[in-house]
Amino acid sequence: MSNCASVALKGIPRDCASSVGGINRVAIANYSDIKTVTLSTGSADTAAEITQIELKPEAKWNFYHFRKGSSSLVETLNVDQATGLNYVSSELVMTFARMESAKRAEISALALNEIVVVVEDSNKQYHYLGYSEPVAASAGTGQTGQAKGDANNYSITLQDDSETFPYLLSPECAGTVFSTDN
């Protein structure tokens, strides 16, 4: 834990830019396939961000796409003053329309692996889950629905517990990660 007196507050100015909810796509790799992750130190004017992710030879990113409004990332700060507990729990809920064998198999594989995840949100920000420790599945569902208008889908929740909110990727690093996504 850092010295609390050494943490400088800087304030947050009002942001007039539009902000859109939701996620566009996700890149996932096995945790064991990550060779290095380079984190910039940041400065008085900039926050630390991930500037490079190097995979081991033969390793690759796998890409996941969703219907609009069907998936989300929630980052929750958990603090207990009495015990000194302070961590961030990030939950990525990915929902895939239509129950099919290939999707069932992929959900099952995700549930068993230790992974890292890059989430592209609707504001073109890229969140890195798995910096401190592997991301793992914490829940999942498959549902047929009851009526014609009900959802028929698979859903999986991937969880990351970390000391901080997930680091964002630099635009160049994000471009490299998603460069092979068709």
Language-model-detected regions and their locations in the chain:
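Solvent-exposed edge beta-strands and adjacent loop segments
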Residues: 2-4, 14-89, 134-148
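Short, hydrophobic/proline-enriched secondary-structure or compact coil segments at domain edges
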Residues: 23-32, 92-97, 113-121
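Mixed-charge, glycine-accented linear interaction segment located at domain edges/termini
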Residues: 133-182
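Oligomerization/assembly interface segments of phage tail-like spikes and tubes
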Residues: 80-101, 150-164
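Short, conserved charged micro-motifs
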Residues: 101-108, 167-169
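Short acidic, glycine/tyrosine-flanked loop/strand segments centered on an H-E-D-like triad
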Residues: 89-96, 121-142
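Short, acidic/charged, Gly/Pro-enriched secondary-structure junctions
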Residues: 107-129
